């Protein structure tokens, strides 16, 4: 596997179930997880698991988590609060506030009429690092998929705390127990046909594999195929970048008194409060500004914080691999203009049955790649 995001880890998990198969995961970064990683600047985003993540939940149910329970069992229901002009913060029963019965119909109509975001965040007044964070970046099909997903998903779950602690680290331990080789800081620079196999080149030399599954995010995928002189139709576009903050709170704050996690959403600022770890993770989607002065003032106001913040980390998410895909899916069987024996593709931007760029889509695309490999190579029955 090239890449250790959700799709790469899923592919490694399922392929490692087969006898006589050696599995290696190559990750270009110094740590694993892809966009589900946690680096020195904090979380990539508030990690939210929709209630229809059926395939991901199935896999997480097999992975032992921090406390001996499965990772799936450790997920917590997240309360969702939306701000209204008449009642202040209201806990709602639907992810999409315009469909939440707790908000009066008259106010929902007002909200719908008032929601006229500038098509370009750059057109808005104030300091904003949300590069391409605009509706113009969404393809019409992408917008339709997003709307459909908002309507049909009513609730969601979150991790008790940091993504690496509760998701990625347990998953890596599980893969190592399965005998999977995990190699970080191994950027792949070239792919080439080698007979019926695939030659993979990194800084450490060239290795030959029977099968290679590329799970890199679209910009990295395009760069790799171009560098390998492999003719393809993938396009490095349709990506949006959103700034995230990871904030450690004083444990005496009133917002932490309720032990259950909660998501506060207002004016394009989305705040996931994780009381079990005295912290919150903030994602600026359509916020008018993303600079610390503006965002931290919003967080203080929305959460009614009284004390100094313990620590603040800001992740601007400007690298190509940190984007969110909002373009049109690419079919894996049409990505290459000429088929290449032994080369497969997976990832949340690869065509799958989930409507938006999400962990569930990454899993479904990985499962499709695994099915194709099993068919093409007549793999032995799983253990």
Listing of model-derived features with the role each one plays in the protein:
Residues 146-202:
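Helical element adjacent to the flavin cofactor pocket in flavoenzyme catalytic cores
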Residues 18, 186-293, 302:
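Mid-domain catalytic core of redox enzymes
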Residues 10-21, 177-178:
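A short, Lys/Arg-enriched amphipathic alpha-helix followed by its capping loop at the start of a domain
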Residues 1-7:
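Beta1/beta-strand and adjacent pyrophosphate-binding region of the FAD-binding site
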Residues 16-39:
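Glycine-rich FAD pyrophosphate-binding loop
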């Amino acid at each position: 596997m090239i890449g250790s995001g959700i799709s790469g880890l899923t592919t490694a998990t399922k392929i490692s179930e087969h006898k006589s198969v050696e599995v290696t995961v190559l990750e270009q970064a110094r740590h694993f997880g892809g966009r589900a990683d946690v680096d020195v600047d904090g979380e990539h985003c508030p990690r939210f698991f929709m209630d229809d993540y059926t395939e991901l939940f199935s896999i997480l149910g097999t992975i032992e988590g921090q406390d001996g329970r499965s990772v799936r069992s450790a997920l917590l229901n997240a309360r969702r609060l939306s701000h209204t002009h008449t009642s202040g913060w209201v806990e709602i029963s639907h992810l999409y506030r315009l469909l939440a019965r707790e908000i009066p119909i008259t106010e929902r109509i007002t909200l719908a009429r008032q929601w006229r975001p500038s098509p370009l965040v750059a057109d808005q007044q104030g300091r904003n690092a949300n590069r391409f964070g605009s509706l113009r970046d969404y393809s019409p099909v992408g917008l339709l998929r997003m709307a459909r997903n908002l309507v049909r998903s009513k609730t969601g779950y979150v991790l008790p705390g940091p993504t690496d602690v509760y998701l990625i680290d347990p998953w890596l331990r599980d893969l190592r127990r399965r005998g999977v080789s995990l190699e970080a800081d191994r950027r792949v620079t070239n792919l080439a046909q080698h007979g019926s196999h695939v030659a993979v080149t990194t800084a450490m030399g060239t290795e030959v594999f029977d099968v290679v599954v590329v799970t890199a995010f679209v910009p990295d995928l395009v760069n790799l195929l171009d560098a390998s002189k492999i003719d393809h139709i993938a396009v490095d576009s349709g990506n949006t970048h959103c700034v995230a903050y990871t904030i450690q709170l004083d444990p005496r704050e009133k917002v932490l008194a309720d032990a259950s996690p909660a998501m506060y959403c207002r004016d394009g600022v989305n705040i996931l409060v994780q009381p079990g770890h005295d912290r919150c993770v903030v994602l600026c989607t359509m916020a008018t500004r993303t600079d610390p002065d503006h965002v931290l003032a919003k967080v203080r106001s929305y959460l009614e914080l009284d004390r100094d913040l313990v620590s603040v980390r800001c992740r601007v998410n400007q690298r190509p691999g940190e984007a969110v895909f909002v373009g049109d899916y690419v079919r894996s069987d049409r990505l290459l203009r000429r088929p290449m024996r032994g080369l497969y593709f997976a990832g949340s931007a690869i065509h799958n049955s989930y409507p938006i760029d999400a962990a569930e889509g990454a899993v479904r695309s990985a499962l499709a790649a695994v099915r194709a490999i099993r068919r093409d190579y007549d793999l032995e029955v799983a253990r």
